[in-house]
Curated annotation (Swiss-Prot):
Belongs to the influenza viruses PB1-F2 family. It comes from Influenza A virus (strain A/Swine/Wisconsin/1/1961 H1N1). One of its GO terms (biological process) is symbiont-mediated suppression of host cytoplasmic pattern recognition receptor signaling pathway via inhibition of MAVS activity. This is Protein PB1-F2. A stop codon is present at position 12 leading to a truncated form of PB1-F2.
Length: 11
């Protein structure tokens, strides 16, 4: 969790 480039990061 650090960079959001239009992708929902729920990893």
């Amino acid at each position: 969790m650090g960079q959001e480039q239009g992708i929902p990061w729920i990893l």
